[in-house]
């Protein structure tokens, strides 16, 4: 069971890294140039919207974190590590939770900004940007789908981390470690 769970966690982490990198690349490399007025060109990039910049930073950080944990897993699987497994399990569980929530929050904030770009807001006199930059908006939508898929993968990873932490505690006594 432990070997199967370890393989599953590695597969989930690799999948999450790939989807997170795909999300960051889709957002960061997405540009579209349109002629706005006779000879004036406007270029839409991810730098035009702070939510898109934050999404790129958060997804890159989450991918890096998952890559570090893959390295930790490969080092610990080769050597017989006799450290505080409980402490490391709690740290990994907490960081997994933070990574999931940050990725989900960045995707949701970007989704809110994307809705404003699609529909505009007459009260704030914001124009519908996606009428002019359709391809840009479609690619950002694809990136958001990838981002939410990555959030779901990382939530599954977090459940495995939770299992690793709480299996060490006694089912009969509240927060008491199992006796060896």
From Swiss-Prot:
GO cellular component: plasma membrane
Residue intervals on the Extracellular side: 30-50, 119-139
Compartment annotation: Cell membrane
Chain segments annotated as transmembrane: 9-29, 51-71, 98-118, 140-160
Tagged with keyword Transmembrane helix: yes
Ranges in the topological domain labelled Cytoplasmic: 1-8, 72-97, 161-180
Record-linked Pfam families: CASP_dom
Entry keyword annotation includes Acyltransferase: no
Main location: membrane
Membrane topology of this protein: Multi-pass membrane protein
Key words of the record: Cell membrane, Membrane, Transmembrane, Transmembrane helix
Subunit structure: Homodimer and heterodimers.
Entry's family note: Belongs to the Casparian strip membrane proteins (CASP) family.
Name of this chain's protein: CASP-like protein 2C1
Protein's organism: Glycine max (Soybean)
């Amino acid at each position: 069971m432990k070997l199967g769970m370890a393989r599953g966690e590695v597969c989930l982490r690799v999948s999450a890294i790939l989807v997170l990198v795909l999300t960051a690349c889709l957002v960061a490399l997405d540009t579209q140039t349109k002629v706005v007025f006779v000879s004036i060109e406007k270029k839409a990039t991810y730098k035009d919207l702070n939510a898109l910049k934050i999404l790129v930073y958060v997804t890159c950080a989450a991918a890096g974190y998952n890559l570090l944990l893959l390295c930790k897993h490969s080092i610990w699987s080769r050597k017989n590590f006799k450290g505080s497994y409980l402490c490391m399990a709690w740290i990994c569980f907490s960081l997994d939770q933070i990574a999931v929530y940050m990725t989900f929050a960045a995707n949701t904030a970007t989704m809110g900004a994307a809705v404003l770009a699609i529909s505009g807001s007459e009260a704030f006199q914001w124009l519908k940007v996606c009428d002019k930059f359709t391809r840009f908006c479609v690619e950002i939508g694809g990136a958001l789908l990838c981002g939410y898929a990555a959030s779901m993968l990382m939530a599954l990873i977090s459940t495995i981390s939770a299992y690793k932490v709480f299996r060490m505690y006694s089912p009969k006594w509240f927060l008491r470690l199992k006796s060896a």
